């Protein structure tokens, strides 16, 4: 009961979907840097941004993909998308593959494809590059160091500059 009562519930959830996890330093810096741009949506008196990681490789021809990690990532992502999950912001390594497999994104103008089951929507009109947003590109995210997930170190901004931002669509029946 204690864990349920005192559990921190995020106000904003961001889903990172890529072939490998982001470095812990980058995730922490991103959560901290986004917090001032968010509000206390759940009314608990705190603003909490949470970045959830989904390790998924949408390239079926990639033979170096670990089947167990792939299955776990796909299962978790599918559960989040199908259960009416709380994630609406996506940080994507492969936006084309993500949209083709999930059909979950809305267009940049806020409209959604006519049929969410149709995955031939133009994904380029549904995302923007991290570097195309001055606010995101200007965040002070510092550097990441090697850890259990990442073998190298470098600039978190440089790492994120290769990703795209997309927003989950909301369809009405």
Regions found by a protein language model. Give the residues of each.
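Short, polar/charged alpha-helical segment
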Residues: 24-48
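Acidic, glycine-anchored loop motifs typical of Ca2+
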Residues: 40-53, 58-62
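Gram-positive cell-envelope targeting signals
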Residues: 1-19, 26, 30
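Solvent-exposed loop/turn segments at secondary-structure junctions
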Residues: 19-23, 95-99, 171-172
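Extracytoplasmic "Venus flytrap"/periplasmic binding protein-like
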Residues: 66-135
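Extracytoplasmic/periplasmic substrate-recognition and gating elements
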Residues: 55-71, 79-89, 157-173
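Loop/turn elements at helix/coil->beta-strand transitions in domains of secreted/extracellular proteins
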Residues: 10-13, 44-46, 84-88
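Periplasmic solute-binding protein
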Residues: 120-173
